[in-house]
């Protein structure tokens, strides 16, 4: 750079430095103009009012408020599944339908590639409509990656590695609080047992979920599919008319625990007979389990089951004596009102000429068949209610998970 350029540059800088001074001086000339107009005088006052905004120290407390930063509120419900059998796979389907994020599946007896096949194809509920594959060591369902483990014991499953999810215990093995607590030790936040439990708090959606206590209940049972069908029906009848006593029979589809042909059965000999060939009388704790969710019915209900040669959908027959006399039409109206109101999505009502296969894939816990029921008189009635013992029950498991999560927040 030449000396001349430097001089010019210095001159320019000097000129720039001098400019701000005149800029500050010109404001006074507009002031006289403002004085010429009497109206602008009130303007300075609003300007002063604008200066008052210093009270915005109030906004800082807003960001400082810790409640929104409490973390758990925005946290997303994540689910882990232990046991990829009938219920485990249908729980995954229900989660995908309801937008619940599944982060891991554990089953020591099923290879990951075979998991894809078993989840994709189902003889009862049909082929999965979305995409499913095994990619990069993970089960990928609808582009959603799910970690796969093959641990034999709950305490070995690395639930912490997948964010400590809510776990569905669907092996049918770890049914007690002590046995299921190993999931908690391994990092699970909550455990829902998809079967009756001898000692875990039992919940049936639509009946007693409000009794859930986040502070003391980290392991709970979703009861059985039959209890989920019977309890909503019994609740409506008992609250409206009163149940003096009752007997329940479930005509139940065969399950994986039965034999395709005659075989050994240590617990009950009849259970070992061919499931496809026989109607098999069997025991069930479903009726007595209702008293866990409706304590007022303790000592008033019991029941039994008939296992029949159908793959899915079962039906409950509740025969009971009413405390308050009522015509069958009044009973129908009470159930219809509950199905449209507080028990919508749990209890349903139909007057169609239906049969069992009409309910395959029905997500309700209990579908009251108004035309199938009968009454001997106004005090003694037989009530019939259908349920998809696989699909409907799996949806209730997911609903219970969501409810617990909402309360835990």
Swiss-Prot record:
One of its GO terms (molecular function) is NADP binding. D-glyceraldehyde 3-phosphate binds at residues 224-226, 255, 284-285, 307. It catalyses: D-glyceraldehyde 3-phosphate + phosphate + NAD(+) = (2R)-3-phospho-glyceroyl phosphate + NADH + H(+). It is an enzyme of class 1 (oxidoreductase). NAD(+) binds at residues 86-87, 107, 152, 174, 194, 389. One of its GO terms (cellular component) is cytosol. Belongs to the glyceraldehyde-3-phosphate dehydrogenase family. The testis-specific N-terminal extension mediates tight association with the cytoskeletal fibrous sheath of the spermatozoa flagellum, possibly via interchain disulfide-bonding of Cys-21 with sheath components. This is Glyceraldehyde-3-phosphate dehydrogenase, testis-specific. It comes from Macaca fascicularis (Crab-eating macaque).
């Amino acid at each position: 750079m030449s000396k001349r350029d430097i001089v010019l540059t210095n001159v320019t800088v000097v000129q720039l430095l001098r400019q701000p001074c005149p800029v500050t001086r010109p404001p006074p000339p507009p002031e006289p103009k403002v004085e010429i107009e009497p109206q602008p005088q009130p303007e300075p006052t609003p300007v002063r009012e604008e200066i008052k905004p210093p009270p915005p120290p109030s906004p800082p407390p807003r960001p400082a408020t810790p409640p929104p930063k409490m973390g758990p509120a925005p946290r997303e419900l994540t689910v882990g599944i232990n046991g990829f059998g009938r219920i485990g796979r249908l729980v995954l389907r229900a989660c995908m339908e309801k937008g619940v994020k599944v982060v891991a599946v554990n089953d020591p007896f099923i290879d990951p590639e075979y998991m894809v096949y078993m989840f994709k194809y189902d003889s009862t509920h049909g082929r999965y409509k979305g995409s499913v594959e095994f990619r990069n060591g993970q089960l990928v369902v609808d582009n959603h990656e799910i970690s796969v483990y093959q641990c034999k014991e709950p305490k070995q499953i690395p639930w912490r590695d997948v964010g400590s999810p809510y776990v569905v215990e669907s092996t049918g093995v770890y049914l007690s609080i002590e046995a299921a607590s190993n999931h908690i030790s391994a990092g699970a936040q909550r455990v829902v047992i998809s079967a009756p439990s001898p000692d875990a708090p039992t919940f049936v959606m639509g009946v007693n979920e409000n009794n859930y206590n986040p502070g003391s209940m980290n392991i709970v049972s979703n009861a059985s599919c039959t209890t989920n069908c019977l309890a909503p029906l019994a609740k409506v009848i008992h609250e409206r008319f009163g149940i003096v006593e009752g007997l329940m029979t479930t005509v139940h589809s065969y399950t994986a625990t039965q034999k395709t042909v005659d075989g050994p059965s240590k617990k009950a000999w009849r259970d070992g007979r061919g499931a496809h060939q026989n109607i098999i009388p069997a025991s069930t704790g479903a009726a007595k389990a209702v008293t866990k969710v409706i304590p007022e019915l303790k000592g008033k209900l019991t029941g039994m089951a008939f296992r029949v040669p159908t793959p899915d959908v079962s039906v409950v027959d509740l025969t009971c004596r009413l405390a308050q006399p009522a015509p069958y039409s009044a009973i129908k109206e009470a159930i219809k009102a509950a199905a449209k109101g507080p028990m919508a999505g749990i209890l349903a009502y139909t007057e169609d000429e239906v049969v069992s296969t009409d309910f395959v894939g029905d997500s309700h816990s209990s579908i009251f068949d108004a035309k199938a029921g009968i009454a001997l008189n106004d005090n003694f009635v037989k009530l019939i209610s259908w349920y998809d013992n696989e699909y409907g029950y799996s949806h209730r498991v997911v609903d219970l998970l969501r409810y617990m999560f909402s309360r835990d927040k």
